[in-house]
Amino acid sequence: MAENTKSKRLFNLPETKGTFQLEGLITDCAKDDFYKEGKTQKGKDKRTLSFGVKVEPDVKVGCKIKAFEKPKVYFLKREKNGEKTTYKTKDIPWADRFKSVKELGLGDDWSLIGSRVGLEKETNGKGQVVNKKLVLDPFDLTKYASEHMADNQSVFIKGDIEYGSFTGGDGTKRQWSRMSPTQISLTSKEIDLDDEERKVRSDFKQTMVFTNIEQEKENDVPTGRFIVYGKIIGYSSVDDAEFYMTNKKLAKTFDKKVKPYSSIEVWGHIKTEIQTEEVEVEDDGWGEAD
């Protein structure tokens, strides 16, 4: 989540949104960059939470939340009139974000616009053990999650896919994408990654501006995959994106039917393999019996 000053946009194009869902086991909580606090260039507080989710024994998806102190937060109220639903919002000073709706002088039908989290268990009125559900500003979610997350927790996560680019020291433009969670919840049952009957949930959905499709090749030999090229339109940037497909029939349909610069929605599975390397260590004799 980039620091957003909501300055006037340089172009008037609708943003293309992307979302994802994961179920798996938390990992990387012991890494140095798991949770960090700092300051922005303008002196505002910032927090970062970085962790992984193992969705298969050899597949890990990285997640990252970047959040900043803001002047205010917003509360939302839904009003239903017949089949029509309307929404009202009210801005609340940042320092008052933890106050109850009663303390803020709002009714019970108002709620904070924020991220959902359920990383603790509690017993409800029916005697059932359920997740303790909270709604927090992303800034507060990072700290709370860092205190309640642990490796190998079974979780369900959903959120937004963020894109951006930067220019490296060599002048080369580099693209990046980030899975930014808006919900982190414990699952009702423990997840066994080795269960062959388990249905893997590691999915994304992305609206994009289609530009081209081509067959992927290595050393001029087709790999069996096709690369879909497109543009992701953000609030203040337009970034390149690539998606891969293996369905040859669908690839032909894209090539013949989808015109360049059409707005399309793509979806599929997130596959990020865990890189491993076997290293041979020369035996120095330590620990061996005489």
Give each language-model segment a name.
Residues M1-D290:
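OB-fold and OB-like single-stranded nucleic-acid-recognition modules
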